[in-house]
Amino acid sequence: MRGSWLFRSCLVRRSDGYPIERVQSKRIGRGCSKRLARRIEGSSMDERNRTPREQRERSTNPFGKALRGIFGSRFGLLWIIVGLILFYNLYAVFRPERSGPQSEIAYSSFVAAVEKGLVSTVTLSGQTIDGQFTQPLRVANGIVYLPGEPLPDTVDPAQVRSVTRFRTVIPENTQAEVTAFLQQHNVLLKVQPSGGASLPGLLLSVLPFVFLIGLLFLLGRNLSRGQQNVFSFGRSRARVYDVERPQVTFADVAGEEEAKAELAQVVDFLKNPAKYHRIGARLPRGVLLVGPPGTGKTLLARAVAGEAGVPFFSVSASEFVEMFVGVGASRVRDLFERAKAQAPSIIFIDELDAVGRQRFAGLGVGNDEREQTLNQLLVEMDGFEAHTDVVVIAATNRPDVLDPALLRPGRFDRQVVVGLPDKRGRAAILRIHTRGIPIAPDVDLEGLAAATPGFSGADLANLVNEAALVAARRGKQVVDRSDFEEALDKMLLGTTRSLLMSQEERRLVAYHEAGHAVVAYFTPGADPLRKISIVPRGRALGVTVQAPEEDRFNYTRNQLLGRLAVLLGGRAAEQLVFHEVTTGAQNDLKEATQLARRMVGLWGMSEELGPIYLGLGEQHVFLGREIVQDHSIGTSTLDRADQAVQRLLNEAMERAERILREHREELDRLADLLIAEETVGPEKIREVLGEQPVAAGDD
């Protein structure tokens, strides 16, 4: 048996007992050869000498493993080098020679150039002619301009090219005439067969695909050997900021002082945990940033990363879920394991609603993968050990769709509202965004903040950038007030359109906008007028802009009734002046109807129904929360609500008509001024309309 050449399976083990490889030995008595055993034992020693990170990368990176299998083989590397050299040589030998840019020219221009003796060589292939001029000639739009020939006025100089190589197509069945014509003018003629691919061209077309197929075959063969870890999707894709953290601090965030204070306390807890632990305080496990889009939730998280001296893991919630079942839960586990290993640390999850939606409890089938990811997130957040010093910060602009289990204390202990900034906050944000921009002394940031109610931090940053773009386009060295005004008009009203309107239509639009303005001017408590314009912008033919002097957080019934009258002022002016109404009031009617429905159904401001909430006019934000809304409201109550809405609109229309009849002269003057100047500011509005009534107290 000692000399037998039978094969036997042998399982080689490392020195630590872990099986390495199953090999075939030629001798039954001896087992595995000593040389093979030494080689495998050496490879196991190399594996143990690698760092944990290198071992993890080698085991979880299948593509890197495959490439090592290719380039680690002498024969595989040799074939790759031979293929590359062969492809390069074939391309270098058979590639067409180029002596300059080639241009398509007309056949008539080609004939004229031959007759002038300006064509040196020609290659004829079927109906296609490739040739070369004796000298560079000017070509524009397929026409060749001979030396000394002037360019027509209709030719754009930017389209003129100087070329030495050209291509043209000859008429059918004229090869014999063209050949004789070229020989007559002593042009060197070459003929190539048309149709069918030459051997060099075929090789150049096929070799890259053969090489690619071979490479993919080698990759697939190496991947199949380690199919257990072929897809390393289970690891979290969170980005870690430790040493190279974002250069954003709380000083770069303005307008959200309360949110900054909440997050600053979390940062201080992570930097100095001992002083909190001494008195038994527990670090909040989660902080949820809630607010509209563009208010700075992600910017606050970046500021936390810049302020905190601890590892900061940043990930988008959409990165958890993939097409494979269980990947999301695996990534959540991996993320929290990495964070716990480097505690104290912070995990930031952006757009939490991507995985934190309320779990499905209705008809049909829910999203099992997303729900598994959410369940794993709930377990990880609630399964922290005491004093692990790991904080989860999440951001969302859709808190109403989040699962209640995610919002309970013990998971997200704090909900920080990041709302729209007030006037003072907007001014501070503008000062931050204009730090690196040269602005003129006439720019009033306080006034600009007052003129932008409802703007978020992202809107204000865009406003400053748009103003800088306007100034750069005008060739200015600084950004002045006019640049900011144009940028603000562009954001609020849209881009100016070069729309040609007739005089009658301009007059109609002028009276429509003047009607809005006159009703707003003579309605006590209405917002001041900032601008009236009949210049078409966006989808509107004209616009009347009102801006409150101070931010408002509550509106009285009288203020809303005045707003209804202002919205219907344009339609009332059309009816009064032209005894006809147009389609220009469509958006006004839509806004007025929605406002009246909210007054009746949400705020209880109707005399017919009194203080009652019906849910009318409520904006149902997100589908999937409830398929059908259950209104336990009688039909008679809904009919009365519709009648109340109609009454509010009719009374507002009558009020607008009454104001316009009383101030018909001012209406005509303002409309004439708009026709003449197109855009009118607040100073000229006061000159035309006279003294404005003082706002009276509410009823």
UniProtKB/Swiss-Prot annotation:
CDD domains: RecA-like_FtsH. Its EC number is 3.4.24.-. The gene is ftsH2. It comes from Thermomicrobium roseum (strain ATCC 27502 / DSM 5159 / P-2). Zn(2+) binds at residues 512, 516, 588. This is ATP-dependent zinc metalloprotease FtsH 2. The active site is at 513. It is found in: Cell membrane. Binds 1 zinc ion per subunit. GO terms for biological process: protein catabolic process; proteolysis. The lineage of its organism: Bacteria, Pseudomonadati, Thermomicrobiota, Thermomicrobia, Thermomicrobiales. Gene3D superfamilies: 1.10.8.60, 3.30.720.210, P-loop containing nucleotide triphosphate hydrolases, Peptidase M41.
